[in-house]
Amino acid sequence: MIKTEKILHLNSSKGRKVRVVREHYMREQVPCGSSLCQADCQNVGKVLSRDVTHYVVPDVGVVRDFLEILELRELQGIVLTQTAYQTVQHTRGRRHYNRLRSLLKDPRHDCVLFANEFQQYSYCPREKGESQDKWHTRNVYNAAVWYYNHLAGLQPVVMITEDRDAISEFSASNSGVFVISTQEYLLGFWPDLQAAHDLYHSIAQTLQERENDGAEKVYTEHLPAEVLEAGIKSGRYIQGILSVNKHRAQHEAFVRYEGSASKNTELNSDVLINGAKHRNRAVHGDVVVIELLPRNEWKGRTMALTEGQGEERPLEDTQSQPMPTGRVVEILQRNWRDYVVTLPPFEEMQSQSRNSQKILVVPWDYRIPKIRISTQQAEALQDQRVIVRLDSWESTSVYPNGHFVRVLGKSGELETEIQTILVENCIHVPPFSEAQLREMPVNTEENPWQMDSNEVSSRRDLRDSHLVFSIDPKGCEDVDDTLSVRTLPGGKRLELGVHIADVTHFVREGSLTDLEARSRATTYYLADRRYDMLPAVLSADLCSLLGGVDRYAMSVLWELDAETLEVCSVWFGRTLIRSSYQLHYELAQSLLNGEEVEVPELNPLKGSQRDQKMSELLQALETLTRVARHLRAQRDKGGALELEGVEVRAQLDEEKNITALVPKQPLEVHETVAECMIYANHWVARKIQESFPHHALLRHHPPPKQEFFNHLIDSAKAHGFSIDTRSNRALADSLERAVDPRDPLVNRLLRMMATQAMSNALYFSTGSCPEEQYYHYGLALARYTHFTSPIRRYADVIVHRLLMAAVQLEKDESPSKALACNKELEELAQHINNKNRAAQHSQKQSIELFQCMYFRDKDSHTDERCVADAVIYAVRANGFLAFVPQYGLKGAVYLKDREGQVISVDGDGKCEWKPGTLQKYSDKIITSTSTGTHTFYLFNHVTVRISVEPSRCHADSLNLELISNKPHCAVQPESQPAGGGRSGLVEEVVRWAEEASLQAEEQRGRKPKLSKEEKQFRQSKTPNLYVLLQEISELALMDLSICQITNSEEQTCTVSS
């Protein structure tokens, strides 16, 4: 080993250039990462494939500017040097560096890191007077030469660089190392890879135009690091995340300050950032530092409805009381991602630029500003949705600069809109690769899968001793949970069992299938399709606990006192099960109700044998219901919340067109199953936290901020109810009492308002969170995790592995594999939280898409389906917000139009526009015209007309128009008593199976012809079904207008178990 010194010029935390001298050690033996290695290097982890024609070594500039091209999976045999890696780490942002790390860690990319600066024959010290850029390029070239010689010339090496001097100097130095530009490389080696060529031209053009010609500054410069550091410590500056109000994207954004970063005790709300100038080039989601403006410059949030998302027009006298207002002084971390945009109409482009090469494109997301891109394909991209990426936003530019990536498709087409939703939510779900499918077990008629005898002997066999059954939606194929309940000998104890598909038996940790599942983190359910987390051979077959077949399971078995139902003991472990009955919810409920119904599994039996089996099944269902009621009562005592919601699903005709949107009726058996799943999740959480106190994956639900309950409290007060929000128990009791016997919808709306106040339930590692914060507020449980849906949630896969490790520790056995440390688990938890949020948003957006499709082809003035009953649940300066229970919609209803006319109501309740005025109060709004006055109160029923508001650049939206101040005559009476519906919190537990099985039901009824890809990957491309399942959390997110007056869009959050 050789010791020397290395001189670095780094940026300090205060933004200064610092000269650093570090000890530098070099040695002969450094892993090369190639499968062609001739020197027996100790290569650990990924190695480069031998099935490539060459290896490619990009220099620092290429890695810095053209990383997107290197991320294409078609490019193989990439050797990233330590020189390039560390330079990017020090000179580019964290997001760019994390992308580079992900590229190296992902086994699907044929790319390795070569520590060239530790290899004594590869590293070259910096020469006197040599620029840092030249030194870096020379080091990368030396690494390429060393690599070629190390492999004994078995593989040509191509170094790509944008340094023309380097190309001239090195191109003829070594016959086995070729030094060429990025463009020459793509033309010579990848002439047919159009995606790479498009990216190159777009990025290169943007880089050429980045140099500014001395234009005047539009925005103030960001503050230097040393000023920021001192200001944050003193409390002058506040750090937080910028959230843009999509309804007034040019004017309103809010910063939710993080923790106690500010010492300003007056800050009990978010900080308003008013106008683009004060936003100072920050984009929605950026981590920013802000400075509060003087108090006399504080402004209030807009209290009026805006006509359409992103609508901008003057709104006098419609602001709330002044609130803390600030300006952005620095952007700590960019949240840039891929954006879907639409080019403006051709005539508008001509006015922007004569040559139509520099164009302002409009993002699909209202919260993102217009982006300037350069393209020579402007005419061809008309009416297309395209993806762009941001490159820079200089202080001299009104808009950020970006570059074109690729075309998604024609605007308005179903497939394009679905792909837009996926891109906007950063969801990447390609078909499972051949390598991943090769890891899967085979189960065909010719080669049926069989259980392994050693595996069978190591498990507890419940096949003959337990009556196991599943309760799922009709047609469910991916059954990941089953139940059992029986009276133990002696009659003094019951045994309750929850049996979950043993996914971890088939998905080995670190396998390609496991890595893909980790990347996806969840199964994505859209309105017309799903993207599975696992291949179909597992999710719909070998991991599905179907009736009448032997399956591996992970089980939790409780012994309960037969009278008190208190837990006497609990057992965790791997089992063998055979489900006797595959029931659906309606069938199970009918059996419990004493109705004469047909159980398919009992059809072959006759007489007394059939009666005996039916009696056993009924007894099990009744006992299970009794146990579930007890479990729910126990949680209720602790303060579990019952938050109301509406589920809606679509009915289709034979041509797969939506014919109706139908609310789904809740059943007690739904909650029975959910309570058992919650109980299993809770006990597994206790077990893994006790065994691994510093690195167990749990799920907590933090208590909401009290100010978020203001809307709920004020609305309830207007109707004569008092809501106590000091604890979850107090809130639950208050909501239970807030019942209007004349209108059950009042209670349901109050529960929805409570949902909007809730924070998100999140995964976390126990070593990263104080124990007092483990509590799940909504479920009223001290410990909670997810264990019961490993087919669809990667969090459950992690928990299964932790549980088995805990069981092994109990037996004084070492876990079969090393478990993730706290840091790794916390990073993974954050990844899963982000993906879950993306899945939720994408499902909500796809439902909205299909709701618009349902109403789009209907004449709102003649079709009675476009007229519906609505309930007022919030009052604004120029209208009110209404809920349409028939379709599960929320939206804005305007009482004042652009011309200043207001709604006038005649004697029959019909509405028309007339000159007049509005007066807004906390619980009502009064319209006054020459014909009289009319008052609209909170919780009044009115009649609205639903129509579609088309948009060229954004998603279509639904418009609610008031046509009568009276309830709609066709509205159906509420059949459900207030407070008696399914809990929105337990909804998530059963929602997974419902969504998937509804698709299976549709498929069975129609028996569509599937393409080869659909059969293999079970990821449909054609619109073969529409499933619109809406739970309480999604109803909150569907609110079309509430975000105008909340601090930020994220304040309308979900509450899920």
From Swiss-Prot:
Residues 230-301 form the CSD1 domain. Pfam families: OB_Dis3, RNB, Rrp44_CSD1, Rrp44_S1. GO terms for biological process: mRNA catabolic process; rRNA catabolic process. Residues 1001-1017 have a biased composition (Basic and acidic residues). Its EC number is 3.1.13.1. One of its GO terms (molecular function) is 3'-5'-RNA exonuclease activity. Residues 359-425 form the CSD2 domain. Belongs to the RNR ribonuclease family. Catalytic component of the RNA exosome complex which has 3'->5' exoribonuclease activity and participates in a multitude of cellular RNA processing and degradation events. This is DIS3-like exonuclease 1. It comes from Danio rerio (Zebrafish). The lineage of its organism: Eukaryota, Metazoa, Chordata, Craniata, Vertebrata.
